Amino acid sequence: MITSAAGIISLLDEDEPQLKEFALHKLNAVVNDFWAEISESVDKIEVLYEDEGFRSRQFAALVASKVFYHLGAFEESLNYALGAGDLFNVNDNSEYVETIIAKCIDHYTKQCVENADLPEGEKKPIDQRLEGIVNKMFQRCLDDHKYKQAIGIALETRRLDVFEKTILESNDVPGMLAYSLKLCMSLMQNKQFRNKVLRVLVKIYMNLEKPDFINVCQCLIFLDDPQAVSDILEKLVKEDNLLMAYQICFDLYESASQQFLSSVIQNLRTVGTPIASVPGSTNTGTVPGSEKDSDSMETEEKTSSAFVGKTPEASPEPKDQTLKMIKILSGEMAIELHLQFLIRNNNTDLMILKNTKDAVRNSVCHTATVIANSFMHCGTTSDQFLRDNLEWLARATNWAKFTATASLGVIHKGHEKEALQLMATYLPKDTSPGSAYQEGGGLYALGLIHANHGGDIIDYLLNQLKNASNDIVRHGGSLGLGLAAMGTARQDVYDLLKTNLYQDDAVTGEAAGLALGLVMLGSKNAQAIEDMVGYAQETQHEKILRGLAVGIALVMYGRMEEADALIESLCRDKDPILRRSGMYTVAMAYCGSGNNKAIRRLLHVAVSDVNDDVRRAAVESLGFILFRTPEQCPSVVSLLSESYNPHVRYGAAMALGICCAGTGNKEAINLLEPMTNDPVNYVRQGALIASALIMIQQTEITCPKVNQFRQLYSKVINDKHDDVMAKFGAILAQGILDAGGHNVTISLQSRTGHTHMPSVVGVLVFTQFWFWFPLSHFLSLAYTPTCVIGLNKDLKMPKVQYKSNCKPSTFAYPAPLEVPKEKEKEKVSTAVLSITAKAKKKEKEKEKKEEEKMEVDEAEKKEEKEKKKEPEPNFQLLDNPARVMPAQLKVLTMPETCRYQPFKPLSIGGIIILKDTSEDIEELVEPVAAHGPKIEEEEQEPEPPEPFEYIDD
């Protein structure tokens, strides 16, 4: 057994090259044991490698590489490994080889990334030996069928040739394509390279045996290429593949931005016969009047009904097909279907609201209850609770009245056709001026009903804002207009809001500043930024500054590194409100990107800024950046949740709520639980609201602590001595937990993985309830119906069932609260004589004996009852339109005997086009009527009575 390598090392000093070669071979065999000893003479081995005439110089490089590896000098080790050429065996499983390959890939990646950012002439040449090892690694991955690993390395090293080759050579091309698309959506931070990858994916998808148009369009949304999408839709219509075109249109509406959709609509309009403007489509420069609107609706209905009875061979005219596609893309169709779903499946428990109403004793909690009611009934059009409690509702005065009126907009969200009739009593009238708070709230409500889908209502709100007589109506009008014209970047709307901002009125200015951001959402408009930041630095009103702080951030939505210069200047501003705006701008620009630089900036500000509001905003903003990977958020904010600063603790709670919304994440709930007992009341408020955001739509089975939190909300609300702040949080939490009649969830991304812009905006503005309660209503923008809606070729809902392959209780609605039974009044105890007591004792003994005889019978009866209790089935059939929670989608299938086949997997959910495989007549789901005030039709006057003779007695 060798105890020293000294003898072998001494051979390196010999003159004979063969002895040196022998020594190197021996050293290679023992280097792992004697590397420390060999390291003292490593210079001799290096000299041998540098000697061009030495035959085994590659072997010298290999030994030197191993010595440096053991010394921890990985860079030198890598250099010598490259010098070893083929002697460095990439297929070896040793720790040395694995480490050097990792270093090699890191080094190669770094060089490739640096080169990618340089112009063509300045690119540095990459060491061919380095590339050779990386290529061998790629081949090894392919040989071992480790395709995901190869795709990961190919994307990191920017090798699109290998990326494409790996996908095409894999044994599961659709699976690899889906994996690659997911990587593009969630992990890629460089926009330019991501676009190149998406182009490759589009090419592969299109070259498949059966082109996958649905996923191609998802890629094209990311590439911001509406023209290509329009071309695909036209191609599908020409090929008579209408159902696929409709499915793509629904997916586009759910995932694409307003600008993108309006470009596609514009392109479709220019193809073939010209088409009348479609009601509801946003982003058109001129909006049709209400008369045209009703005309186009009528013709639309006539054309669609004309084809119901036709044979399958007769295809509709191209004009009608394009009309339908535009109706879907404008969002009108999806909004109508979601409204139908929410009205039909409304499962609100009014008992919860009644108990809360009976417990509240002050105006703040009164407002909170009104907001909670609107959340619970969001989109259901059911205002029953308000009608039943008109006297209680009338207690709302001033701004509380404004909030209460606006809450109707949340209840009737999406109920667009009758919006003006519904709100008629609350809107400004020419004849007599009503309550300004009511009128302002009414205009805000109209905006909430038409959020992100303005159409004709934009012009109505524009005129109302022009003619508004006081600051309260202007406040509501600005918010309503901002919501309806969200993301349209319409110049006339922008100019009017800017005029309102420049009036230097605090109440008007706050809403106008926010509305400017909503209208210019994500536009990165330099003029808008200049106007808003310039005015923010001039104004003395804190309210206006607060509105602009959020507005500025919204203009930079989704702009990533393009917003860095603005973020830098805002973060350096001496005004804390503008620094807070910097935090929100980071949140909006990098939302959903998981960008490390953005996270580092927020964490730094969270612990270093001198202003509490800025620190709180910085921590809250973490939730927006991390929402694609909610499991990461608890570890990032866990230390912040224990901060000595209560504002940071509040921010940590809200960050968890935003990031893990709707997931039921156990770690997040475990962090929030101790915060519900925090000594500071507003931290408790944040923890209560965040817990509801996380546990929305969760059941006892999917999230065991949900009932415990329900009881906690109730306890806080009913405790007379608890603080108003905590009560406000608990009441809002109740509303969020049961939102939309138990049929909606909160998610910041669409079903297909795109960032859902209205949700992000809604949640950001919702967090501003800290300063201004009426902004709580913005959370309604983030509510997404959890539904599967199947449609036939005529875009009607057929009667069809879906099979949920799990026990019904797993995703069931929560049991309603029981009405408490009235307690019987206790009888006053009477004096008992000793004789009576003895007599009663004897009677009891008799009864006992009889009971013993009866026991057998009762036991038998119990057994019978247990037998009757049937075991729970392992599946459940759900009727179309079905309430299907996100986790339930995985177990959803079509019944085997079903005549319909879905155009895309049911596991994605949402609106799905169904292909009918039968010739039989279809049964359709009857639409249900919306609730709310109806305009009473004039009754016909009764006929006069028959003539008669009056005889006076």
From Swiss-Prot:
UniProt keyword annotations, A-Z: Acetylation, Phosphoprotein, Proteasome, Repeat
Composition bias type Basic and acidic residues, residue spans: 290-303, 842-852, 859-872
Superkingdom, taxonomy of origin: Eukaryota
Gene Ontology biological process: proteasome-mediated ubiquitin-dependent protein catabolic process; regulation of protein catabolic process
SUPFAM superfamilies, sorted: ARM repeat
Biased composition (Acidic residues): 936-953
Example of a GO cellular component annotation carried by this entry: proteasome regulatory particle
Sequence ranges of the PC repeats: 403-436, 441-474, 476-510, 511-545, 547-580, 581-616, 617-649, 651-685, 686-726, 729-761
Disordered: annotated segments: 279-318, 839-881, 930-953
Short name of any one Pfam family annotated for the protein: RPN2_N
Stored PANTHER family: 26S PROTEASOME NON-ATPASE REGULATORY SUBUNIT, 26S PROTEASOME NON-ATPASE REGULATORY SUBUNIT 1
Family, similarity comment: Belongs to the proteasome subunit S1 family.
Known role: Component of the 26S proteasome, a multiprotein complex involved in the ATP-dependent degradation of ubiquitinated proteins. This complex plays a key role in the maintenance of protein homeostasis by removing misfolded or damaged proteins, which could impair cellular functions, and by removing proteins whose functions are no longer required. Therefore, the proteasome participates in numerous cellular processes, including cell cycle progression, apoptosis, or DNA damage repair.
Record protein name field: 26S proteasome non-ATPase regulatory subunit 1
Organism: Homo sapiens
Gene giving rise to this polypeptide: PSMD1
